[in-house]
Amino acid sequence: MGYSFGDFSGHVALITGGAGGLGSEAGLWLAAAGAQVVLADVDADALEHTAKRFGELVPGAPPLRPAQVDVTDSTSVRGLMRDVAASAGRLDVLVTSHGFPRDHRLLEMTDEEWSAVVEVCLTGTFICVREAARIMVERGYGRIVTLASRAWHGNPGQANYSAAKAGVVGLTKSVAKELGRSGITANAVAPGLIETASLRDLERFEQIAERARRDNSIKRIGEPSDVAAAIMYLASPEAGFVTGEVLHVSGGRFS
């Protein structure tokens, strides 16, 4: 599939979790549409690899800016946001695609497993949204797209991840109600099972994929491009009357 969706020329987009499968795909689509993309991730090596891919896949796009950041460190996030605004003069789009699961059944889940997931997935999203919103409010424009998950409905073995992603949905709806008067929209994309490299690396990948093909209304596993297309719409100027929504990209499997 080609990377094509609207015109983002002159726009600046910052994507957290930018070296991951979903974040990097969204970055490719935004860059191909003319946006100046800042890919932020805690993994410097993965960022370097992703930056090389960008040069090969979208050679005519504006220069990519990789940035190493820990989303749970408010000082680091604030510094990055301010640096982007100072150098580019604006910040139009924030996509928060960072996060990870650490699965265990409830009775076996440790405090550390709970805290680690909630800290990154929920608190990290709050910090990034808050700091981006400070810049967007000043300009009177912004598109905030958070990555939730189908798990926000509740998944067995994922009490931590499900709670964090449900929190992301609540956070997004609150932000939408607070910042709409400032020209800022906030929406969540809730992917189902998407075939990323990290999923393919699982020993049980084929079993997981077969179950998705069986249970989904659309009989296939999702692709990163499916999620990127949803992000692109919600990040676009044309989505100015859409806010506080959760867009499921799950092949019809909502819960």
Where are these regions (language model features)?
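Substrate-binding pocket helix/loop in short-chain dehydrogenase/reductase
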Residues: R105-L106, E113-V118, I208, A212
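Short, small/polar-rich loop/turn modules that mediate ligand/substrate recognition or access, typified
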Residues: R90, V95, G180, T185, ...
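C-terminal helical subdomain
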Residues: A188, E210-V242, G251
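Canonical Rossmann dinucleotide-binding motif of NAD(H)/NADP(H)-dependent dehydrogenases/reductases
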Residues: D7-V38
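Catalytic loop of short-chain dehydrogenase/reductase
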Residues: V145-G167, T172-K173, K177-R181
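Short C-terminal tail/terminal secondary-structure segment
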Residues: G2-D7, M232, T243-S255
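Alpha-helical segment proximal to the catalytic Tyr-Lys
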Residues: R134, K177-R181, G240
